[in-house]
From Swiss-Prot:
Matches recorded under SMART domains: TBOX
Protein name: Putative T-box protein 30/42
DNA-binding region extent: 11-192
Subcellular localization(s) per the UniProt record: Nucleus
Keyword Transcription regulation attached: yes
């Protein structure tokens, strides 16, 4: 790399992060994986245009402190609870693979598929990071030049994008703020002072359109005990736990009344389901020009042993 060139990395949606800095919260729990919003997106400059780079994202704890909301409704170190021990670091490579420097600088580098959870089991997925609630995390981008083969990597801690994983929003306005910016966001605020769709009437607000709809009843079905059979004149489909099989009654390979009439289906001469007396490994009958089918009429072949 040219010594005079310095790589610069910024959050492309930095203004959004600044609105909640340094008190950004992200919903995370052990039951499911949840997205990060604002999303993790970068603008990069200072790369060598014709060099190829690999980009790796990680989420790191900024310190070994457990936090909580103080009397001023701000995040502060908690004196009541001890911090959780550090967990293993995870690295997530950019989904689009390696790219040239000029390509990376011309676009917004996105890690929008990243998810977080407090379940170690769910975090086994490639794009899911395991986090501890009530601790402070920061996205870290690592950039390495593969063309020059340099050992040293450029590491960028994006402190503007630090956040606290929480099971429910600790700040009353966080859920509303995210919902206004992102239609996929849920409220999830704590009960004291938080804005919830269920209590919008009690709070003196008009109920949202979503909450005014009548609940839709859904039948609970155990897929492990359900077999769906759809019969037509051409096929029978059996569906059990999403396993789909097709049954063709007219085929000699599958039809019980025909399976002993034809040693093989003309279009699959070496099929392993050939019944006795012809062994699947014995192909001599196939190359025998005098061979005749067990059928009263050899309707499957012409005189040159080619299937009709």
């Amino acid at each position: 790399m040219n010594p005079s060139t310095q790589i610069v990395v910024k959050m492309s949606n930095e203004e959004l992060w600044k609105e909640r800095y340094p008190n950004m919260e992200m919903i995370s729990n052990s039951k499911r994986i949840t997205p990060i919003f604002p999303e993790i997106k970068f603008k990069i400059s200072g790369l060598e245009e014709n060099s190829r780079y690999v980009l790796v994202l990680s989420l790191e704890k900024m310190d070994n402190i457990r936090y909580g909301i103080n009397e001023n409704k701000e995040w502060a170190p908690s004196s009541a609870r001890k911090p959780k021990p550090h967990h293993n670091m995870k690295f997530f490579f950019h989904p689009e693979g390696t790219k040239l420097g000029k390509e990376l600088m011309a676009e917004t580098v996105e890690f929008t598929s990243v998810r977080i959870t407090t379940s170690e089991k769910l975090s086994e997925k490639e794009n899911v990071f395991y986090v501890h609630t009530m601790h402070k995390y920061v996205p870290v981008l690592t950039i390495r030049n593969l063309t020059t083969g340099e050992i040293a990597s450029n590491i960028f801690k994006m402190e503007i994008a630090q956040f606290f994983p929480v099971s429910i929003y600790q700040q009353a306005s966080m859920g509303r703020w995210k919902s206004d910016l992102n239609k996929h966001s849920t409220f999830g605020n704590r009960s004291e002072g938080g804005i919830k769709r269920k209590t919008s009437d009690a709070a003196g607000q008009l109920p949202s359109k979503r909450s005014s709809k009548k609940p839709v009843k859904k039948d609970v079905v155990d897929n492990s005990e359900v077999t769906l059979e759809v019969k037509t004149s051409q096929y029978l489909v059996n569906q059990n736990e999403s396993n789909l099989t097709e049954y063709i009654p007219s085929s000699p390979l599958y039809s019980s009344q025909n399976q002993y009439q034809y040693p093989f289906h003309p279009y699959s001469p070496f099929d392993s389901s050939i019944p006795y007396p012809y062994s699947p490994m014995d192909y001599s009958y196939y190359f025998n020009p005098t061979f005749q089918s067990f059928s009263p009429e050899n309707v499957y072949f012409d005189e040159n042993r080619n299937p009709h």
